[in-house]
Design a protein with these regions (language model features):
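Active-site nucleophilic cysteine motif
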Residues: 22-28, 59, 63, 156
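Short secondary-structure capping micro-motifs at structural edges
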Residues: 16, 48-56, 89-90
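Polybasic, low-complexity association/targeting segments
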Residues: 1-18
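Conserved phosphate/anionic-ligand binding catalytic regions in large, soluble enzymes, centered on
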Residues: 53-67
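Acidic-glycine-rich active-site phosphate/pyrophosphate-binding loop
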Residues: 2-5, 29-48, 131-134
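Amphipathic alpha-helical interface segments
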Residues: 26, 31-33, 69, 84-173
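Phosphate-handling active-site elements
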Residues: 36-46, 72-97
Length: 173
């Protein structure tokens, strides 16, 4: 197995595991990519990622992948303040890699919004955000709830693998 393929497989394995370990899709994807590529995730970024697992719009897995791409190619605040022009090359790379990741989501799930991904996985959007929906979700058969997390774990697995593959491809250029 090539080194690149090994890293992609590691990210996929960690993605499946980390959805539950880190309590959500966005931090799960971010941490799977970070642990695979030795990216440093600080407390503030990790804390912020929880908000992207809140069924608020974009798929949290996509957000976690984009955050990892930002860690890899972004410019830190201190460097940006010293030289605002330093972000031009970084921004161009980020546009290319995030577009590639969005495209993977669109191809696999028909879009990159949380409700589009859920509709592809479950045939409908499962949004336990209102009191009624949360109550109904809590009353679901435990096997169905396990199935829900299993399917969501597959998205985290894919997102982490795609993100690592796209980063490694960009690094080769």
């Amino acid at each position: 197995m090539s080194e690149k393929k090994g890293l992609v497989e590691k990210a996929r394995r960690l993605g499946r595991e980390y959805l539950r370990k880190y309590g959500g899709c966005a931090p799960g994807t971010l941490m799977a990519v970070a642990d695979t590529l030795d990216l440093k995730v600080g407390d503030e970024l990790f804390k912020a990622m929880a908000g992207f697992s809140s069924l608020s719009g974009l798929c949290g897995n996509l957000c976690g992948g984009i955050a990892a791409m930002g860690l890899r190619y972004g410019v830190g605040l201190e460097d940006f303040v010293k030289n605002p022009g330093s972000s031009s090359l970084s921004f161009a790379k980020l546009m290319r890699v995030t577009k590639a990741l969005r495209q993977k989501f669109a191809e696999e799930y028909g879009g990159y919004l949380c409700d589009q991904v859920q509709t592809k996985l479950f045939g409908k959007c499962v949004m336990p955000t209102s009191p009624d929906e949360l109550e109904a979700f809590g009353k679901m058969d435990p096997e169905k709830i396990r199935g829900f997390y299993e399917k969501c774990s597959s998205v985290t697995e894919n997102a982490a693998g795609w993100t690592v593959a796209i980063i490694l491809e960009m690094d080769e250029k």
